[in-house]
Amino acid sequence: MRVLSAVDQLFLRLETRNQPMHIGGLFLFRLPDDADADFVGRLAEQMRTSQIPPSFPFNQILHRELFWQTDGRFDVEQHFRHIALPKPAQMADLLTYVSQEHSKLLNRHSPMWECHLIEGITADGQAGQRFALYFKIHHALIDGIAGLRLVQKSLSPTADERVSLPAWSLMTRKRHLIDSVLPTDQSLLRVAKQQTRALPAVGQALLRNVVERFDGDYVTTTQAPDSILNQKVSSARRLSAVSFELSRFRRVADAFGVSLNDVVLAVCSGALRRYLLAQQALPRKPLIAFVPYSLRTDNSASGNQLTFILANLATHLADPVERLQAIHASTRNSKRRF
């Protein structure tokens, strides 16, 4: 058994019916030109009947909500679904289906993940049929970057190569110590001593936190203004999608010497500013975003290795370049603490 890390437990304890703590990924694929009508059906059967047992973290089940243990009664039928949308299905129908599924809590009495293989999609304005993979996994098991890496590893590197194993049967590296169980040769007393020795570092971090409050780029939750977006969250989810060329984001990032994530935040900031202006409800103070920040330094594809930073979205600035630069200064300042 593995002891749940503090981060794992946090995601479990914060979860409510109206605030699910799972993450998801939607992947859209084009059928090969020579694919017959049963192409997706055969793919589904191949994934469902894989003889390779599920690997970590897909074989982990909660024990008393304190430990992870291997599920000895794993049943793929509880996790994998093959769905054919009613014809003629458009992208809006796919997004509606995923929105409904993403609103539902995962079952804590089995490994907390699902995979949906969805066929019968006609992409808007594009020729040919599409099919999709929708993955849903609890954040206590894995973070977004690790989840994306697992899915990428399960995909064929070329269009001509067949998929060999579903994502849940891939062998993953052992969890890093930050996410793992206490080593067997380590007693709770030794762990307590280690934590006690860490107290001076904690004190230094708290002192640095106080000093940094005088930095002009320092962001706190108390700086966030009230807005029409401050509403109680319901259990319903609504998914929308838009496609961009990644190269466009990279060109902007390179031109202004900022990160790709800064550009994404700037796009979100611009959209929020435009929406709030249209509603005549733009706050004078900038919105503050709660942004996940990866601490992953290796190529591992499991566990939670992340924290969160606060980012000034600079929605009070009309000039998009000034807005991007303000966002970059804010995120850079927040990241310095790690």
Residues covered by each model-derived region:
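Generic start-of-chain signal for non-secretory N-termini
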Residues: M1-H22
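Soluble acyl-CoA-dependent acyltransferase catalytic core bearing the H(X)4D motif
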Residues: M1-V7, L26-D36, E45-I52, P57-F338
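Surface-exposed, glycine/proline- and aromatic-rich loop segments on solvent-exposed faces
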Residues: R42
